[in-house]
């Protein structure tokens, strides 16, 4: 995405970014109608991928068409993020709503300076979910106006595609499975971690049965061997270190105890935060 950006180019976005925006919208200060923040990502030979984001505190003044961003907060948070993810750069900004707001041109000027040589993009997402759909659109500003006269900006749609990795698919399938379960008392809760482990183990067992059936058929000359499948099986077997059953059982039980300890600690912290929040509300009243 250079200054001569092609409107036919595609920009990819990670599902985690969408969940981060929804989380920021749910945690927005009382009285605020929308949230906005910085989009971060990578640029690889003209292919852009939005991988991260963070909200930026702001205050709108619609009567005078002005918006005040907490620039110091945005700069400090960006610097902190760069220490952890040094390959991420500013790609633009996001805001919640149904369409591009009037303050978009003002924010474009700020993020154009932050993006440097690339042109910033603007992600608009309807986080209210009133239509039961997550409406997400990506825009890019184009200069319009008469030569020698006053210039303006027009925000045009840019193709956007969700990029799913293996870890993303696991999480999305878990969310989909939970959302399709009817009759549960708490639909908003995730599946217990141990249930997910059992489901993953059952899926691996089914795949192993399929592989063993194929190998036995090839050895019994019931099926013609496939070199592509053989190389894939060889790569899968050599990628896993050779362990005896006792060492594997010990390693699995150790990881399982660590996971149970993490679940217990997170539950205790969550309960403590809920109690602290209720006590603070009682003091305010």
Swiss-Prot record:
Q: Which organism is it from?
A: Drosophila yakuba (Fruit fly)
Which biological process, per GO, is one annotated for this protein?
formation of cytoplasmic translation initiation complex
Localized where?
A: Cytoplasm
- What CDD domains would the database entry show? MPN_eIF3f
Entry function = Component of the eukaryotic translation initiation factor 3 (eIF-3) complex, which is involved in protein synthesis of a specialized repertoire of mRNAs and, together with other initiation factors, stimulates binding of mRNA and methionyl-tRNAi to the 40S ribosome. The eIF-3 complex specifically targets and initiates translation of a subset of mRNAs involved in cell proliferation.
Keyword Protein biosynthesis attributed: yes
Record's subunit section: Component of the eukaryotic translation initiation factor 3 (eIF-3) complex. The eIF-3 complex interacts with pix.
Q: Which gene encodes it?
A: eIF3f2
| Residue ranges of every copy of the MPN domain listed in the record | 11-145
What is the designated name of this protein?
Eukaryotic translation initiation factor 3 subunit F-2
What is the top-level taxon of the source organism? Eukaryota
Sorted alphabetically, which keywords does the UniProt record give? Cytoplasm, Initiation factor, Protein biosynthesis
Q: Which GO terms describe its cellular component?
A: eukaryotic 43S preinitiation complex; eukaryotic 48S preinitiation complex; eukaryotic translation initiation factor 3 complex, eIF3m
**Single GO MF annotation:** translation initiation factor binding
InterPro entries named in the record: eIF3f (IPR027531), EIF3F/CSN6-like_C (IPR024969), JAMM/MPN+_dom (IPR000555), MPN (IPR037518)
* Family to which the UniProt record says this protein belongs: Belongs to the eIF-3 subunit F family.
């Amino acid at each position: 995405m250079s200054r001569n950006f092609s409107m036919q180019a595609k920009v990819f976005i990670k599902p985690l970014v969408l969940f981060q925006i929804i989380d920021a919208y749910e945690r927005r200060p009382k009285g605020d109608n929308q949230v906005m923040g910085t989009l971060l990502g990578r640029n690889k030979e003209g292919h852009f991928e939005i991988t991260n984001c963070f909200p930026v505190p702001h205050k709108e003044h619609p009567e005078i068409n002005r918006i005040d961003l907490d620039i110091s907060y945005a700069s400090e948070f960006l610097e902190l993020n760069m220490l952890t993810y040094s390959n991420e750069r500013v790609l633009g900004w996001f805001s919640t709503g149904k369409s591009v707001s009037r303050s978009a041109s003002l924010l474009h000027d700020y993020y154009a300076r932050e993006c440097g040589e690339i042109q910033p993009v603007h992600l608009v997402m309807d986080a209210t979910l009133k239509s039961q759909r997550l409406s997400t659109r990506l825009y890019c500003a184009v200069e319009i106006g008469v030569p020698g006269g006053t210039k303006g900006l027009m925000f045009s749609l840019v193709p956007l595609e969700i990029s799913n990795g293996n870890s993303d698919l696991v999480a999305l399938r878990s969310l989909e499975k939970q959302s399709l379960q009817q009759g549960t008392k708490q639909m908003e809760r995730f599946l217990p971690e141990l249930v997910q482990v059992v489901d993953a183990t059952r899926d691996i067992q089914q795949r192993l049965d399929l592989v063993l059936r194929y190998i036995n058929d090839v050895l019994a000359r019931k099926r013609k061997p496939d070199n592509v499948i053989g190389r894939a099986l060889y790569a899968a077997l050599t990628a896993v270190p050779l362990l005896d059953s006792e060492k594997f059982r010990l390693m699995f039980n150790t990881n399982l105890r660590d996971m149970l300890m993490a679940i217990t600690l997170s539950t205790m912290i969550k309960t403590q935060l809920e109690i602290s929040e209720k006590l603070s509300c009682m003091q305010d009243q």
